[in-house]
Design a protein with these regions (language model features):
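Alpha-helical cap/lid subdomain in secreted, periplasmic
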Residues: 1-115
């Protein structure tokens, strides 16, 4: 794994792994996201598996885990999916702010940076 190679080359490496996320944009779905909405059960099933894999890797390698999926689930209570994502996968500026705040919260809590 790339993680093993990286850790071998740098024993002081601190890993931060971000949880994958996906949005189901049903209003005016952009062309890039239409296959995701059309095949939502497949995409969402794969996402669930990948979320678990990333969490397991974070646990195995003592990495900081950033729960992006969870943070976006909270954000969806405030605004619809198209506010957070442009095409079901890529974040908007508002989505990037959610991600940045989540990342900072997690790495600060882990002691990687000072408050």
């Amino acid at each position: 794994l790339m993680i093993n190679e990286s850790l071998e080359k740098n024993k002081d490496l601190k890993l931060v792994l971000g949880e994958p996320f996906l949005f189901k944009i049903t209003n005016n779905t952009p062309e890039l996201g239409r296959d995701i909405v059309r095949d939502w059960d497949v995409w969402n099933g794969q996402l669930t598996e990948r979320r678990q894999i990333v969490k397991e890797l974070a646990d195995k390698y003592n990495a900081v885990f950033v729960p992006y999926f969870e943070k976006f689930q909270e954000a969806l209570k405030i605004a619809p999916p198209e506010h957070w994502s442009v095409d079901c996968i890529h974040a908007t500026n508002a989505g990037h702010e959610i991600m940045a705040r989540a990342w900072l919260e997690c790495v600060t809590k882990a002691g990687f940076i000072e408050e």
